[in-house]
Amino acid sequence: MNEKHLAYLNLGSNIEPEINLVKAVKQLHEYGDGEIQKVSNAWESKSVGAAGPNYLNACVAFISPFVQAELKERIIHPIEAQLGRKRSANKFLPRTIDIDIVLFDDKSYNDKVWKQAFVIVPLAEIYPEYQNPLTKETLFQTATRFRQEVWMEARPEVLSQFKWEKQ
């Protein structure tokens, strides 16, 4: 298990998001076999898919020895459980924390993220040059377009304690 993998994670919360986003980043930072490389600002956006409180989302570049399934099982799901995440068939319920793998070893993990401003805008802060494999548009270009189409507000104060990890 000497090989290291770079995962870009999207963290989102709309239940006490200022608290839960910070707790999730701290737990990732404190995980012994992993290392945070970069943290974006938190970004506030409207709830997507159902009425509900606004979300805060941020992206983290995280290095670990685990492949995707192990990363979910050993790190992501335990953090979500510790922070009170309740899994449900309804993907649009409010949640304390949701952690998704967006990119893994420079490969797009889920192509639907290219349509999600709440993922692309924070991800573009920490990896602006990454190109959509289908369109060749960079994250910076996609985020710029989304910022003109969708309301989002940067909330740099939320994760300001992690400045040493930001680029």
What are these regions (language model features)?
Residues E16-I19:
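Short N-terminal binding/cap micro-motifs at the start of the first secondary-structure element
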Residues N14, V39, V60, D100, ...:
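Residue-level signal for inorganic ion chemistry
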Residues E3-Y8:
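Extreme N-terminal starter segment of soluble prokaryotic enzymes
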Residues V48-N54, F66, E73, P78-Q167:
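Flexible, gly/pro- and Lys/Arg-enriched active-site loops
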Residues L21-L28, L71-I79:
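Short amphipathic alpha-helices in soluble, non-transmembrane regions
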Residues K23-Q68:
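Short, surface-exposed acidic-centric catalytic microdomains
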Residues M1-N2, K112:
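Short, flexible hinge/linker loops that cap or flank conserved catalytic cores
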Residues L11-S13, V60-F66, L103-D105:
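Short beta-strand-to-loop capping motifs
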